[in-house]
Structure formats: structure tokens, C-alpha cells
Amino acid sequence: AAVARAEGVELWSDAHFEALRRTMKILADAGQKVITATLNKDPWNHQCYDAYEDMIRWTLAADGTWHYDYTIFDRWVELMLSLGIDGMINCYSMVPWNNELVYNDEASGSPVTVKAEPGTPEFERMWTPFLKDFKQHLAAKGWLEKTNIAMDERSPEAMDAAVKVLEKCAPEMGFALADNHSSYKRYTMMR
């Protein structure tokens, strides 16, 4: 979002992706190897001037099924891979700082914000269908083995709850974190 604002272009437009290419080329030339992507809107709860926008659009269909639009995510990952940033894809976050998830409700045509605290039925209800679908999408793209669900300085209790759902729904995926609790010692699927 910051690049779009600074360049005066529409978010996720062709012009935005071209501006991102120029900016990310600097990172690639400096040796960057990890792609950072968002699973939902603003996983860091607007800690920056520009909130992080969602790269995957979640929609609850009128019939109660979930649909996920990976168009922006795919384009972002493909851009980064084309620059040689290809070590891992770290996706933030199953435990966003505000524990909120945003989706489009097809029946009402409106966005909905849900509070999904780790360890609650709502958390599992929201993340189970997504992780199963995301895993299939990543496998089809050939990215499953390099993709991690990433968390940023979350409590051990919150991470335990998230890891439990991740291991149940997508055990093939890795796990990455910025850790301020020495939690890294607890997880075998760390990459």
C-alpha cells in the first residue's frame, strides 16, 4: 500500500506491480530470499502509516461455502520469484495482532470483520476451510514445500492454538515466526 500511495497509483494495478518490481529489485540485489505475503487484511493491526492490504480475498458464498481469490497473492509471488527471491514464502498471519479476519459476505454484498481468537471455535471455523483450500492451491502452483504460515511475536498460547489447527489441516506446510518468547524451541515444523 505504501508503494501505491507514494507512486500515486491504484492498489494492485499494473502500475502498482511495476512500481513494486522496481522496489523489490533492490531487495533482490541485496540478497533477499524470503517472500512476505498476507493471508488476510492487515495482520500487523495498522502499525505502519499504510495498512497492509489483503493479498487473498475471502468470500462467504450465499450457500455457506468459502471461496478464496488468490489472484493478487499469485501475482505477488510470481513477481518475487521472477526477481530471484525464491527461498521461502512466509504468509502472515493466522494470528494477526488484532485477531480480526475480514471477508466479503456474498449474501449481503458487504465486508464482515470477525474476531477469531486462537483456541476458540470461531478461530477453527474460519481457518480450517481456508488452510485446506490454500494447501491445494499451493500444491497446484508448486509452492507448497516452500510456504510457511508465519506469526509475529504472538504468545505461546496463541501460537499453540494456531499450530494445532495448522497441523490438522495442512501438516505439509511449514511454520515461521518472529519470536519474543523463545517459542521456537517448541515447534518441530519450523523452517
Language model features: what each stretch is:
Residues 1-173, 179-185:
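Aromatic-lined carbohydrate-binding surfaces of glycoside hydrolases
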Residues 186-191:
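Structural recognition of alpha->loop->beta junctions
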